[in-house]
Amino acid sequence: LRMTDKLEIWTLDWVPMANGPAGFVRDLRLRWACEEAGIDYDVSTVPLAEKTSEHFSRQPFGQVPFIKDGEIEIFESGACLLHIARKNENLMPGDPVGEAETLQWTIAALNSVEMVSVPWWFLEITGAKENGLTDWLESRLSHIEGILSEREWLVSDRFTVADLLMADVLRVKKVRSFGDRPASEAYIQRVTDRPAFQNAHAAQMAHFQAADATRN
């Protein structure tokens, strides 16, 4: 299959700027990965307000992000990240052990942490009288805190795509402020201080700010 030197990343055409998800929409993960790997990318959009048949043809759940790389089309941010990471050793170690450890921690960020933190966050913001996921989230975050208190990075003593994804999961505002976890906080700060994150975050914010300006 043919791939290209420039990826196409798809995101939403607009999100509310006031108390909205700008800065956290998951195309940021893919922009960030491209910045880390030195891969050029273009951004295309699908409407937030009305899901189109084209959108569902590219992402069967009507979500973002998804990417097009030549003849290859991929949805789900984790799958997209692994595709990008395999293009460059800045994100994925070239040795079998490093690659395996990176894969396991990338999946752990999605399946062991985010699968708890997102429903917990949703119950928090919707004003649920009781959040039955709090103890579960506490357990997951405590395990991560213990690991990060002993190492700077998750894999191979260096930054990988696993750190990109784990930090993006942990930096969600309510999750980040839930409890006192100094090692996790230092980790989030260390990862998000990287120029690639700063560039990707600024690019996403500029995208949504420009879209918002056309509505005012």
Where are these regions (language model features)?
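GST-like domain detector, emphasizing the conserved glutathione-binding G-site
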Residues: 1-135, 139, 145
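GST-like fold's C-terminal all-alpha helical module
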Residues: 4-5, 97, 106-195, 200-203
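Residues that form or immediately flank small-molecule/cofactor binding pockets and catalytic motifs
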Residues: 14, 46-48, 158, 202-205
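Intrinsic structural disorder
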Residues: 50, 194, 205-208
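Residue-level signature of transmembrane alpha-helix interfaces in integral membrane proteins
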Residues: 54, 179, 184, 210-212
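Terminal-tail/helix-coil boundary detector
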Residues: 202-216
